[in-house]
Amino acid sequence: MPKTETYPRLLADIGGTNARFGLEVAPRQIECIEVLPCKDFESLSDAVRFYLSKCKESLKLHPIYGSFAVATPIMGDFVQMTNNHWTFSIETTRQCLDLKKLLVINDFVAQAYAISAMQENDLAQIGGIKCEINAPKAILGPGTGLGVSTLIQNSDGSLKVLPGEGGHVSFAPFDDLEILVWQYARSKFNHVSAERFLSGSGLVLIYEALSKRKGLEKVAKLSKAELTPQIISERALNGDYPICRLTLDTFCSMLGTLAADVALTLGARGGVYLCGGIIPRFIDYFKTSPFRARFETKGRMGAFLASIPVHVVLKKTPGLDGAGIALENYLLHDKI
């Protein structure tokens, strides 16, 4: 089949809260982007059909190739989302949507592919020196959950992406304050993973733990209705709620620890890339937050980490971009 006959391609980036859809009408050209709340639809297929009905006027041809990035491990045909109610069979969904091919990949595999094609203005560098071209790149990012993956560029220019579930590693507190936060979380959960703190709901959990800290009993606090990640962040940046600022500082410190752990584990001299929608909301604060200092606080490996640049991804739809690149690789090479 001529390459032009594979367009439009149906792309999706499906997280725990929202599903983003788009139509790739030409290489790296995505149109009709829509964001739909997952909770509004009984199933993935229902959401896709609703999306396609909204794009009916723009569709000259029905898509026959699709690529979906989903925030959950892919282990065979049956897919169960980690942070929402959707479950689906890849093959049944392909048939239901009348697709010739449906590629389903982990969402942070898509993020890694997207990073391979990003330009300098898509990123904000936080410290470090320069990326080594063929060294591993670590990709992680807090959102509804916490994703982690690895991107390796071989000497011939080909790419290898290693998916992982690093967000579910056990959280290791760094100091007495983080021990207090961990103890609060441990009273609620059997396993306290990094994702418990480094996610949208994690900001709320950190705030709740800190609000019980001795000496903060009389500090101005948020009402129950205000306990959302967005409001905690806003109050922290406004400076009128010290406990919110401490929450955000603690969040960034914890992220620095995890990012350093991942960088050391992978030898990520190709850089660390922070994805997701949380950090770009407060990027100016993040640049001067405790993140970078904590990232480099690793004893004898401090100098090694000091040279590694950290980049915050600013691009709006990297999940869709990466899903498209993965599908292109599959159609060209019969593998991603």
From Swiss-Prot:
PANTHER family: GLUCOKINASE (PTHR47690:SF1). Signal peptide: none annotated. InterPro entries: ATPase_NBD (IPR043129), Bacterial_glucokinase (IPR050201), Glucokinase (IPR003836). Belongs to the bacterial glucokinase family. This is Glucokinase. Keywords: ATP-binding, Cytoplasm, Glycolysis, Kinase, Nucleotide-binding, Transferase. ATP binds at A12, D13, I14, G15, G16, T17. CDD domains: ASKHA_NBD_GLK. It is found in: Cytoplasm. The lineage of its organism: Bacteria, Pseudomonadati, Campylobacterota, Epsilonproteobacteria, Campylobacterales.
